[in-house]
Amino acid sequence: YDRLTGYFRARALTLAARGIEGLVRNNGRMRLLVGCTLNPPEVEAIAKGAECRAQVTAHLLANPLKPGNQREVEALELLAWMVANQILEVQVAVPCDEHRRPMPAQGIFHEKAGIIEDKTGDRLAFNGSLNETEAGWTQNWESLNIFRSWLGDDPRVAAEETNFAKLWSGESRHVITMPVPDALRDDLLRFL
């Protein structure tokens, strides 16, 4: 599952728990490219997960993230577990100028699209207004365009895949992308 989103909240993962269970069972992977809008507990969970792949559970218990309620605790634990077990890779996207310098307060990466491939090779792509947040999935009025490879939409699916690959690999001229721990080291998250 490849996903581009302007906003991400860990609680969105709990809404997709059944799908994530299937992803894990089938050795699937998720790549999430999110605008630099992560809140501090989520950045911390991702960073902790990336730094302690061998001992996630013990590390989380020893270093609580201070979320506001039990649902947030569970969402952040799931996020860190997915990162630590290499099921989820997260990168941040920061708009940049023509010299590839981040542009503070000049807009955000706000693209919203996704590509899902099943074990038979069928692919579904979507784009629209939906962010990867609990409110986006359950409360907001959103629009979504869906393209299915098995129904003749293969060119549209391929276009979404190409766009994702270009952004994920850092080949876009006006967006810098990098894994969250790198962003912490490079101080890019000050542009949140």
Q: What residue ranges belong to the model's regions?
A:
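PLD/PLD-like phosphodiesterase catalytic module centered on the HKD motif
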Residues: 2-192
